[in-house]
């Protein structure tokens, strides 16, 4: 509870104690002998203690031309109650309204907590070495390439690469992951995480304004400005609703006495009851609070949603499209299969590794990594790269060929075609075929589970787009049980495929695209919902996306769908409940059946119940599993 909330709580307690005393005194007849002005002054004390700020806000807003708001309604209703001699009811209305406001403030604080935890990732300083001493500087002043020192317990201020030291890194604030990650020399590291056990020296790779933490803070700060359709509806509704009910209350106070005759006091009281009931707090508070709670619940599991409009769109998602590399697969080439012909697997791998020893191609690197031994340069010579074919090289004095089918055909080597999914590397020496290696991009751990979860939450179609060969793409799609696959695509082709999928959708259906690369930015922008990888993803992809997975775990997309649907369900419940109760009590108040106490329930009671309902959105810890 904040200092301001504690002060309000004290005002409520003092006012409540005085209210109870006055309530007892009135019912015992103690106040009856006093003149009306003395009673008014006595009841004004607890009223002003608890409600002076409401009167001040209403007066200030009126002076600024903003007349019709909940402060104005409360002021007019309670002044009216004082005017007709209902002093106790006037104090009760203001007291319980402020109880509701305090409760609302507490609820908003709770729902903001996980988001403000994410906001707390901002580092306050960076340590750099000068003349053998550590000097504290502002992260904004650190240039790219500077070596910074991060001690145990300190927050990592800038993105960079570890050049010295080893430690466990707490990434919970960014990714929602409770298990620390190990970082050592050569590892990339992102700002905003907390260094655990060891001192690290890090060479910075980005300025602070371009760092991960700066971008996240910018995204979080902008999230609340992007409203969902239902929020915009409530904003427009409140704009017209409040003036209408105010005019209605005035007419209720004036017209019936003129037509039916009799005193104005009873009808003014009914008009005051009408005003209290009609206060739109339950709607104006609970709807944004529900969406804010949904965004907070998503951030708890490491998913950053950039606005309630995108949270609403996720709830309507029926098609999800994945880029393959880096999203469904690791983007790391591995030698997944060896098919020797007349030699051992070890011999095939050795010759292939030696043959690729002069190449800097990623596939060559994966073969050398699979070999796992130091390359003896003395055994190889005369390497020649043949564009579009492969390499020819002398290995132990024997002419060796490592490459694709074209190379085997060009050298007239009788090879055995390999139909395995992946990139096939053929190996031959002189005119002898030694065999083939299959190099594949491995499927990410949890990718199959992610697809299964998405289908369980009602996503109808899972599609994969890739620039890879048809056979490789089909193999991955079959392994993950995807509904559609489109292969051998250029970046522009991906946009075209998404356009086709969008045109096939019905009203109320939404399409999401999940990607991580710079070339994915146009597709992320074009899709109804763009989902980017926050850890491995490019800055352009994160900027273009509407939702960011802070730890690149696509299993959390299904959890976000559940959170968004629960949020929308609760928001709609609040709207229906608030309008229904208010409509009934408004009618009862207008005909004189409901009194000021029922009016207080219709306002404060409904608001509190709606707020409690909204807070249920935050209870989504089970979705992480």
Positions of PLM-derived features:
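Bilayer-spanning, highly hydrophobic alpha-helical transmembrane segments
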Residues: 14-17, 232-261, 270-291, 572-601
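Membrane-embedded alpha-helical bundles of multi-pass transporters
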Residues: 20, 24-35, 55-61, 79-80, ...
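Residue-level signature of catalytic and energy-coupling elements of molecular machines
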Residues: 58, 86, 107, 126, ...
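Juxtamembrane helix-loop transition segments at the membrane interface in multi-pass membrane proteins
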Residues: 59-69, 103-117, 289-308, 615-625
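Membrane-cytosol interface motif
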Residues: 69-74, 115-130, 299-324
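Cytosolic catalytic headpiece
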Residues: 117, 131, 309-529, 562-565, ...
């Amino acid at each position: 509870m904040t200092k301001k909330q504690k002060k309000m709580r004290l005002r409520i307690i003092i006012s409540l104690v005085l209210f109870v005393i006055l309530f007892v005194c009135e019912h015992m007849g103690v106040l009856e002998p006093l003149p009306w002005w003395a009673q008014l002054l006595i009841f004004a004390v607890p009223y002003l203690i608890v409600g002076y700020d409401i009167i001040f806000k209403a007066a200030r807003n009126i002076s600024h031309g903003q007349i019709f708001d909940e402060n104005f309604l409360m002021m007019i209703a309670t002044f009216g109650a004082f005017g007709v001699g209902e002093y106790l009811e006037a104090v009760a209305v203001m007291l319980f309204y402020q109880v509701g406001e305090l409760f609302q403030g507490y609820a908003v604080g709770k729902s903001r907590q996980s988001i403000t935890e994410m906001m707390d990732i901002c580092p306050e300083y960076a340590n750099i070495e000068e003349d053998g001493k550590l000097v504290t500087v502002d992260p904004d002043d650190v240039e790219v390439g500077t070596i910074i020192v991060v001690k145990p317990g300190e927050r990592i201020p800038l993105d960079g690469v570890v050049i010295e030291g080893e430690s466990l890194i707490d990434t919970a604030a960014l990714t929602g992951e409770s298990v620390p990650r190990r970082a050592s020399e050569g590892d990339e590291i992102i700002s905003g995480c907390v260094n655990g056990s060891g001192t690290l020296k890090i060479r910075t790779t980005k300025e602070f304004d371009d760092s991960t933490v700066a971008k996240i803070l910018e995204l979080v700060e902008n999230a609340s400005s992007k409203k969902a359709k239902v929020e915009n509806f409530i904003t427009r509704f409140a704009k017209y609703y409040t003036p209408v009910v105010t005019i209605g209350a005035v007419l209720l106070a004036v017209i019936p006495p003129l037509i039916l005759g009799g005193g104005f006091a009873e009808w003014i009281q009914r008009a005051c009851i009408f005003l209290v009931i009609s206060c739109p707090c339950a709607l104006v508070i609970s709807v944004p609070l529900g969406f804010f709670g949904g965004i907070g619940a998503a951030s708890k599991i490491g998913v950053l949603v950039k606005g309630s409009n995108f949270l609403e769109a996720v709830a309507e998602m029926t098609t999800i499209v994945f880029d393959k590399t880096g999203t469904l697969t690791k983007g790391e080439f591995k030698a997944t299969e060896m098919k020797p012909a007349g030699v051992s697997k070890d011999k095939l791998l050795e010759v292939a590794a030696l043959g690729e020893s002069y190449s800097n191609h990623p596939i060559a690197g994966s073969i050398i990594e699979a070999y796992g031994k130091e390359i003896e340069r003395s055994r190889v010579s005369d390497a020649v790269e043949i564009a579009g074919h492969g390499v020819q090289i002398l290995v132990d004095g024997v002419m060796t060929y490592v490459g694709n089918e074209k190379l085997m055909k060009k050298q007239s080597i009788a090879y055995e075609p390999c139909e395995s999914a992946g990139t096939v590397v053929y190996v031959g020496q002189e005119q002898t075929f030694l065999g083939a290696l299959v190099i594949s991009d491995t499927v990410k751990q949890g990718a199959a589970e992610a697809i299964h979860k998405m289908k369980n939450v009602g996503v109808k179609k899972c599609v994969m787009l890739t620039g890879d060969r048809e056979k490789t793409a089909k193999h991955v799609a079959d392994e993950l049980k995807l509904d559609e696959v489109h292969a051998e695509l250029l970046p522009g082709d991906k946009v075209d495929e998404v356009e086709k999928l969008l045109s096939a959708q019905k009203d109320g259906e939404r399409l999401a695209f999940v990607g991580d690369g710079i070339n994915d930015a146009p597709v992320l922008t074009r899709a109804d919902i763009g989902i980017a990888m926050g850890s491995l993803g490019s800055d352009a992809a994160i900027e273009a996306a509407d939702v960011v997975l802070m730890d690149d775990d696509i299993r959390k997309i299904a959890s976000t769908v559940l959170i968004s649907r629960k949020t929308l369900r609760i928001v709609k419940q609040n709207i229906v409940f608030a309008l229904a109760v208010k409509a009934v009590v408004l009618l009862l108040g207008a005909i004189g059946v409901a009194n000021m106490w029922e009016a207080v329930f219709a306002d404060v009671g409904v608001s509190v119940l709606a707020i409690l309902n909204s807070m249920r959105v935050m209870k989504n810890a089970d979705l992480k599993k």
